[in-house]
Amino acid sequence: MILVDISNSVTKIGLFKEGELRLLEKIPTAQISFEQTERIAQMYPLEDLILCSVVPQKNLFFEKPFLGRLYQIDPTVPLGIPIHYPNPREIGADRLANAVALSLLYGYPAVAIDFGTATTFDIVDQKGAFCGGIIAPGLSMMTSYLHEKTALLPLVEIKEPSKVIAQSTEEALRVGAVHGYRGMVQYLIEKIKEELGLLQKFIVVATGGGSRLVCSQLKSVDVIDEMLTLKGIRLIGEILIKRKRKDLPFPEGYPPMKGESFPFSLFTHNQ
């Protein structure tokens, strides 16, 4: 099974086969071409493709080469967990995949924090259902916006600051971005716990490009899993393939990947 995660900045392509998930390649989303997707289709002529996209205009690059063997994730398909949300169609496919992986692989209550162009917090409640979340500007947007909207502030590389009290403009911007972002993440985690009425710690899983930089110094983050979204895409994909091929057993390796174990049930979005 080929797994595709089209985000605003980067598209990740993974392969799940014989119980193992591996990342095949990363492509800047703006540079996706038919040449690339047709090459992948020819390399894996028997594999189904599960598409998770938040950039609809890029879907065609996969739909044509994988015609007849493509499954797309959206809020109308069975996901494996309940969705408690007034208008599920508003939820991005990547957020759904993160919630599914979070609930089925890590347990609940829990929150997945995905650091990308935007940073999303997706919450799974005490019963394992997706119950909502938070969307914040991504870390890189903080520095790029200041650079674009001011006359003198430079565009800086985002990396770990050497100290908090900066002695240059570049370092001051870096401190504000990195440490300020950590403060936002920590505060929102505490507010989520408070709103859920949790007196004890719950599971926090971070993913996405900025997850290691931001979360490496946050004790409230339990796991950094850079493959979380692909894992969720894979779990939903198994459900979609099974429903289409009702006469076939689940493929080898399903439900768990190696080292995983979780209960399985089919839920639609309105349960």
Curated annotation (Swiss-Prot):
<keyword id="KW-0630">Potassium</keyword>
<comment type="pathway">
    <text>Cofactor biosynthesis; coenzyme A biosynthesis; CoA from (R)-pantothenate: step 1/5.</text>
</comment>
<keyword id="KW-0067">ATP-binding</keyword>
<feature type="binding site">
    <location>
        <position position="117"/>
    </location>
    <ligand>
        <name>ATP</name>
    </ligand>
</feature>
<feature type="binding site">
    <location>
        <begin position="92"/>
        <end position="95"/>
    </location>
    <ligand>
        <name>substrate</name>
    </ligand>
</feature>
<comment type="function">
    <text>Catalyzes the phosphorylation of pantothenate (Pan), the first step in CoA biosynthesis.</text>
</comment>
<dbReference type="GO" id="GO:0005737">
    <property type="term" value="C:cytoplasm"/>
</dbReference>
<keyword id="KW-0173">Coenzyme A biosynthesis</keyword>
<feature type="binding site">
    <location>
        <position position="85"/>
    </location>
    <ligand>
        <name>substrate</name>
    </ligand>
</feature>
<dbReference type="GO" id="GO:0004594">
    <property type="term" value="F:pantothenate kinase activity"/>
</dbReference>
<dbReference type="GO" id="GO:0046872">
    <property type="term" value="F:metal ion binding"/>
</dbReference>
<feature type="binding site">
    <location>
        <position position="169"/>
    </location>
    <ligand>
        <name>substrate</name>
    </ligand>
</feature>
<dbReference type="GO" id="GO:0015937">
    <property type="term" value="P:coenzyme A biosynthetic process"/>
</dbReference>
<dbReference type="Pfam" id="PF03309">
    <property type="entry name" value="Pan_kinase"/>
</dbReference>
<dbReference type="InterPro" id="IPR043129">
    <property type="entry name" value="ATPase_NBD"/>
</dbReference>
<feature type="active site" description="Proton acceptor">
    <location>
        <position position="94"/>
    </location>
</feature>
<keyword id="KW-0547">Nucleotide-binding</keyword>
<keyword id="KW-0479">Metal-binding</keyword>
<keyword id="KW-0808">Transferase</keyword>
<dbReference type="InterPro" id="IPR004619">
    <property type="entry name" value="Type_III_PanK"/>
</dbReference>
<feature type="binding site">
    <location>
        <begin position="5"/>
        <end position="12"/>
    </location>
    <ligand>
        <name>ATP</name>
    </ligand>
</feature>
<keyword id="KW-0963">Cytoplasm</keyword>
<feature type="binding site">
    <location>
        <position position="114"/>
    </location>
    <ligand>
        <name>K(+)</name>
    </ligand>
</feature>
<protein>
    <recommendedName>
        <fullName>Type III pantothenate kinase</fullName>
        <ecNumber>2.7.1.33</ecNumber>
    </recommendedName>
</protein>
<comment type="subunit">
    <text>Homodimer.</text>
</comment>
<keyword id="KW-0418">Kinase</keyword>
<dbReference type="GO" id="GO:0005524">
    <property type="term" value="F:ATP binding"/>
</dbReference>
<comment type="similarity">
    <text>Belongs to the type III pantothenate kinase family.</text>
</comment>
